[in-house]
Amino acid sequence: MSIQPDLLKAVLQPLLSAGHNASAAGISDALASMMSVNADVHMCHPFGDIKGPSAWFKACFEPLLLAMPDLERRELVVVAGTTEAGQHWVGTCGNYMGKFVAPWMGIVPTGRLAYMRYHEFYRIEDGEVVEVQAIWDIPELMMQAQQWPMAPQLGDSLCTPSPMTQDGLRTQDDFVGQGAQTQAHVLTMLNDMCKHPSQGGPEVMNLSTYWHPRFNWYGPAGIGVGRGEQGFRDWHQIPFLRAMPDRALDPSGLTSHWVAQGNYVCETGWPNMR
């Protein structure tokens, strides 16, 4: 049974509101009010799996707030819906921002405004969050502190902006369509992309069919931003395929949860890439 997307988003409202002017008490109370005490939280390395809102706050948010006492959470896109399997998910992306004044996870503070992109997904049952799958772009913060230990990224560095259309935070009534056509478009695109290189040259991907000629690809830190089809290929896809030419949409042993609204599609899984 599907649930209206706006009702799903409302479950997250305590956190979204507390993030405007974050404090330890505000974030802690927000998580406690919207999450099951037994919620499974799957965080990126080095945090790993965490049980419950209190432990999540202690492991992740409390140290971040000590490093950035004026922390704020800036949502860019929030998408909600029910998957084909009947699960209810809310997907969010945005930037954590604040003045970086104290060390965090061994990263030396800059004393300046810093930002860290996040992608967080929340599974909801009976009006509360029962699972979280989240990635914080910690390398992005390392680069701002000039503490990146690996090779320079090929793409550009940029604090990810909101969509040009400025409609990533719309309510359900404002979205045009239910997203099914958009999701089908994305899935077809991914299938075509996986035809290269095993089934032919770059032309078999039909990239111009799916992408605007002036699109931006906002890769994670370590890869960076590319402009247009050529930028995507030069700074991400070609180096990626040289390293992992056998990547494919292989569902074996992996999970994938898709929801879409209007022109927006989000997908998560833990794990969902091999």
Give the label of every model feature segment.
Residues 1-274:
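C-terminal and inter-domain tail/linker signature
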